Design a protein with these regions (language model features):
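Glycine-rich phosphate-binding loops at beta-strand->alpha-helix junctions
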Residues: 32, 169-198, 209-213
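Glycine-rich phosphate-binding loop plus the immediately following alpha-helix
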Residues: 82-123, 213, 219-228
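Adenine-nucleotide phosphate-binding core of ATP-dependent small-molecule kinases
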Residues: 135-170
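Short glycine-rich, Thr/Ser-proximal phosphate-binding strand/loop in the N-terminal lobe
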Residues: 1-8, 13, 84-92
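Acidic, glycine/GT-rich loop-and beta-edge segments that sit at the periphery of enzyme/chaperone cores
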Residues: 74, 223-266
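Glycine-rich phosphate-binding loop of actin/hexokinase-like ATP-binding domains
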Residues: 46-107
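Conserved phosphate-binding/catalytic loops in two-lobed NTP-binding clefts
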Residues: 44-48, 195-218
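Short beta-strand-loop/turn "lid" adjacent to the catalytic site in phosphate-handling enzymes
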Residues: 1, 16-49, 58, 77, ...
Length: 266
């Protein structure tokens, strides 16, 4: 699903089959949507702003939000009367969904299997999650020592929790109630439990909504933009596919090579 435009277009067409070809106001958010917004001239809301607006509008007593995405992780601290304070890791795969993907490959299992394996773990081992390279080495050592995949899977999630807490809190207290956000925390129970252990909290202190992976999108509803774009589902789906086709054609033609011949290169 790396083809963002076509993936969104397909989802819109599926939605059309359920709710009809309704009119909708379009707002884009998320790192993957920034380029799409610029190409199509659509309103864009920064993800942290969308998330913050969702929390404020929900009337939930949220003090902290922990978000683990595919390529970054962030913690947002909420304090009444103050601007939300964000800490983000976007420079390394450590503590992100990409890190989970890497570790699943090392273990030779599907990402979906890691959670079930971790639920049957008996021991937690130290794994360096700050860097995927070091973590891979640690996991390979555990495999060589015949440590069970169950224990390794649980240790991977424990390492992610440690990485996010230690690198992003930066001395600030992570106070409950904590809202969990992003695909990994929404779908992986063992990862949520790892945060409970590391923060010494109960399950009720961490709030995971049914659609926690869509919190930024829902936050766009409460975010004001300078421009408005209203269209039908089918029209927008077609626009996405057309924009994606033109971009593909451009990328295939590409820029001119620096060296026109092997002789110039040598």
């Amino acid at each position: 699903n790396a083809d963002v435009a076509c993936c969104v277009a397909d989802i819109l067409l599926q939605a059309e089959n359920v709710i009809g070809n309704v009119q909708a106001e379009v707002v884009i958010t998320g790192s993957a949507g920034l380029g799409l917004s610029e190409r199509l001239g659509l309103p864009f809301v920064q993800e942290v702003i969308a998330v913050s607006n969702f929390v404020k509008s929900s009337k939930m007593e949220i003090n902290t939000l922990i978000d683990i995405g595919g390529e970054d992780a962030k913690i947002i601290f909420f304090d009444k009367g103050q601007m939300p304070l964000m800490r983000m890791n976007g420079n390394c795969a450590g503590g992100t969904g990409a890190f989970i993907d890497q570790m699943a490959v090392v273990l030779g299992v599907a990402v979906e299997e890691l959670d079930a394996l971790a639920q049957r773990a008996e021991h937690i081992y130290a794994i360096a999650s700050r860097c995927g390279v070091f973590a891979k080495t640690d996991v390979q050592i555990l495999v060589a020592k015949a440590v069970s995949k169950q224990d390794i899977a649980a240790s991977i999630f424990n390492a992610i929790a440690l990485q996010v807490i230690s690198s992003l809190s930066k001395g600030l207290p992570i106070k409950p109630k904590i809202l969990l956000c992003g695909g990994p925390l929404t779908y992986i129970k063992s990862l949520r439990q790892a945060f409970e252990r590391q923060l010494h909290l109960s399950e009720t202190d961490l709030l995971c909504l049914e659609y926690s992976n869509l919190i930024p999108a829902m936050g766009c509803i409460y975010s004001q933009t300078q421009q408005s774009f209203v269209t039908s589902l089918s029209e927008f789906a077609q626009r996405l596919k057309s924009a994606n086709l033109s971009t593909t054609c451009q990328s295939q033609s590409g820029p001119q090579p620096i060296f026109s011949s092997r002789g110039e290169l040598l």
